[in-house]
């Protein structure tokens, strides 16, 4: 399969760019590089113009399917399945709040175009979430799947070892993701305690050697605490001296309760894929070739 992504923050020399595990974060972007390292059988293609990137990928790789990362509003490319990712914030206090007063790009009516909803939850109780799903999403009649990132251990950035936990020892958390609270909750669930300190950086932050030295100094000040980072940050931090001893949070997706769905997500998606893949792949490739002719 092929993943088409805009590659936020990427600075490739040419487009489209096929991202390999050996690419640099500056060239490929942190998220495409993480995808390339985590999914070795997939082709990760960076191109802000998804139609061009899709045609290029189809011509070279003849994929069974193409996945658009953040493509719900990308109208130049027709889709067969639209999966809309929502958070508890989207369903509760952020419901229907379109930019600039909120994080939504479109109003509630756009949700009718979804094939299914994926709701990303975090550890702990979330008051009002089940009711919001029942009253705000379920009436749309589309399958709804909840999921969470479950921690499964730690790994050294330099590849020297893995651990299930830190045996109760102190740690600090350095993270440059959009929702630091999620990383804090995931780390605390795995390690059984809150971090001594959280060092939040901007999403997609380009870590420097000075940042690494600052993180190490904060850890020393906290009693030689361990340093824990997210996998997204690790692909950038591992390039710098002194970061090899940092721990990366290893996570996996676990699905939870579902609504309007008779089957688990994997089975539901597999059935849809089998219905659509062969026929529509041919249509997509023909349309791309005609457009570029």
Placement of each model-derived feature along the sequence:
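Conserved beta-strand elements of the Class I
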Residues: 2-4, 84, 170-174
